[in-house]
C-alpha cells in the first residue's frame, strides 16, 4: 500500500491445517506463474481447489523478454535454513519464520508442529523466471505499485498466512534487513449470494485411497 513489496502466501483449509496449498501440483496444471482463472490446489489426499484468482492488476505484465513473470509458484520461500547454509548466519525474519510465528500465535501450536505444515508458497507480486542459458531461477524488481492487488475467490473456509518478504521488491536480495519493505494489506469480502448460483462446491478428491493394497 506504500511501495513495491512482495508477499509469500500460505493457504490452509481453516478447519484442517493438514490440507494446505500444493504449489507443485498447481504449477504442473497451470505453469510457473498463475493469474486470473487459475486455481490454487490443495495437498494430497484432498486435492481440490482452495481458491481461484478472480482479479489481477498485474496481468498486463505477461512474460518479459527474459521469460520473467509475476505471482510465481516455482520459488519456495526464503527460509533460515538455506540462509544458514549459504551465509552461516542465523536470520529470524525470513518468510518461513514469519509464517511460523504467525501460526504459532494464531493457532496456539508449538513451532515444531507448525514447521511440519508451513509449505511452499504463492509468491505474490514476485517477478521471477529461469535464465535462458543455465535455466537457473532468477528474481527481478517487482513491477507492483501501491493500489495493485490480487483477488481470490475462496472455495472453502480458508486460513491465509501472508508474509511481507524481507526482500522488499526482491530486486536485490532477501534474508536480510537491507531491502526497503512496505506493508501489505489484506481485505476479506462477502460475496453477493446471487453470484454464487450455479457454482459447484469444491469437494475433496473422491479417490478411494486403496493404492493397490487390497483387491
Predicted regions and their residues:
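Acidic, Ser/Thr/Pro
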Residues: 1-215
Amino acid at each position: 500500500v506504500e511501495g513495491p513489496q512482495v508477499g509469500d502466501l500460505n493457504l490452509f483449509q481453516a478447519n484442517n491445517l493438514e490440507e494446505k496449498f500444493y504449489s507443485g501440483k498447481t504449477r504442473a496444471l497451470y505453469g510457473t506463474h498463475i493469474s486470473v482463472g487459475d486455481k490454487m490446489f490443495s495437498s494430497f489426499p484432498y486435492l481440490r481447489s482452495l481458491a481461484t484468482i478472480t482479479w489481477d492488476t498485474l496481468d498486463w505484465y505477461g512474460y518479459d523478454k527474459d521469460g520473467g513473470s509475476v505471482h510465481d509458484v516455482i520459488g519456495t520461500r526464503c527460509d533460515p535454513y538455506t540462509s544458514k547454509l549459504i551465509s552461516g548466519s542465523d536470520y529470524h525474519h525470513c518468510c518461513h519464520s514469519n509464517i511460523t510465528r504467525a501460526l504459532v500465535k494464531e493457532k496456539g501450536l508449538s513451532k515444531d508442529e507448525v514447521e511440519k505444515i508451513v509449505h511452499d508458497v504463492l509468491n505474490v507480486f514476485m517477478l521471477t523466471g529461469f535464465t535462458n542459458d543455465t535455466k537457473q531461477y532468477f528474481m527481478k524488481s517487482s513491477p507492483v505499485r501501491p493500489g495493485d492487488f490480487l483477488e481470490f475467490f475462496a472455495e472453502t473456509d480458508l486460513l491465509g498466512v501472508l508474509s511481507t518478504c524481507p526482500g522488499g521488491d526482491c530486486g536485490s536480495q532477501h534474508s536480510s534487513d537491507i531491502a526497503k519493505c512496505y506493508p501489505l494489506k489484506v481485505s476479506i469480502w462477502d460475496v453477493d449470494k446471487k453470484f454464487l448460483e450455479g457454482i459447484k462446491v469444491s469437494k475433496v478428491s473422491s479417490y478411494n485411497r486403496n493404492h493397490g493394497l487390497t483387491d
